[in-house]
A protein has these predicted regions:
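Cys/His-rich microdomains that often coordinate metals
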Residues: 67-68, 93, 122
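Short linker/helix segments within small regulatory modules
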Residues: 72-83
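Conserved alpha-helix/loop element of class I SAM-dependent methyltransferases that forms part
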Residues: 85, 91-112
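Core SAM-dependent methyltransferase catalytic element
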Residues: 235, 240-273
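Short cysteine-rich clusters marking metal-coordination/redox-active sites
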Residues: 61-64, 86-89
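Conserved SAM-binding loop
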Residues: 109-208, 216-233, 262-272
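Short beta-strand micro-motifs in enzyme catalytic cores
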Residues: 57, 82-85, 259-263
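Membrane-proximal basic amphipathic "stem/tether" segments
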Residues: 1-58
Length: 273
């Protein structure tokens, strides 16, 4: 399975021996409490894979159609995300929310919508490409994209060429996010929209900055002050609560977390030459 969430590939369920070995290694590395959470999350996934058909349906993935009693649990040294990853397509809460929001967004625009998708995830590509007039992609390291080797903070993308720019959990990986947001704005037509999701706690005022990107490639964990950054480059900054899209048919849940937020950045502002 690809390490990139949303790769439209089933997640591999680990065996009990592998879980025990992983847990021991983390504990010996000094992360004792995190090791316990890892063992619990992976063991719960192991049990779900074997007993899930006996349990009542509670969730449905809008990206691939999976239905089951729960999504899988994802753990790292910082936290555990319960009921997070689809076992069939590896979508996360943000992918599932965007897969429901973006089609409606595109339908509201003119029929010839040109979309640029940074660091494209297969689960979202399957949703967007069929309904976009033009669907292009960019990435710094990924092969098979329209614009390979593209660093948004040193953008070489064509200016004023796209109607919608999707940037899903990308900015936190870029050291100079101010330059990256400027790059988003330059790429859009005057009435264009950037759809941005980022990790953070938006009840917290300030963004937490890290000394390096050793935590999953992240340079920061955003706070509400990101709105000030967006407002430097866009006329309108809209906050969308994706959790409002959580209800699936039959009383099921799409597994879209409370607080799952997307930002719609409308109308790029002119930038100095």
């Amino acid at each position: 399975m690809s390490g990139n969430p949303g790769g439209f590939k089933p997640r591999r369920i680990k065996g009990l021996r592998e879980i025990a070995a992983m847990t021991a290694r983390r504990a010996l590395g000094g992360h004792v409490f995190s090791a316990g959470a890892l063992g619990l999350a992976e063991s719960a996934d192991w049990g779900l894979a074997r007993l899930g058909k006996l349990l009542p349906l509670r969730v449905r993935c809008p990206c691939c159609g999976y239905q089951g009693p729960s999504f899988l649990h994802v753990n790292n040294t910082k936290k555990t995300s319960w009921n997070a990853a689809c076992p069939m397509c590896d979508s996360r809460s943000r992918h599932r929310g965007l897969s429901l929001m973006i089609p409606d967004l595109l339908r509201r625009r003119e029929p010839h919508t040109r979309v640029l998708h940074a660091a494209p995830e297969a689960v979202l590509r399957r949703v967007i490409e069929p309904i976009a007039a033009v669907y292009h992609t960019s990435d710094l390291r990924m092969d098979g994209v329209t614009y390979p080797g593209e660093d948004l903070s040193r953008s070489r993308l064509p200016e004023a060429s796209y109607d919608v720019f999707l940037c899903n959990h990308v900015l936190e990986h870029i050291r100079d996010d101010t330059a990256a947001v400027a790059g988003l704005a330059r790429t859009l037509v005057p009435d264009g929209i950037a759809v941005v999701t980022i990790p953070g706690d938006f009840k917290r005022r300030e963004t937490k900055h890290f000394d390096d990107d050793s935590f999953g490639g992240h340079w920061r964990d955003y706070g509400r002050d990101v709105l000030e950054l967006f407002s430097k480059f866009f006329k309108v900054v809209e906050t969308v609560d994706l959790h409002e899209l959580d209800k699936a048919p039959g009383g099921l849940s799409h597994g879209i977390f409370p607080g799952e937020t997307a930002f719609l950045l409308r109308g790029p502002l002119p930038q100095p030459a």
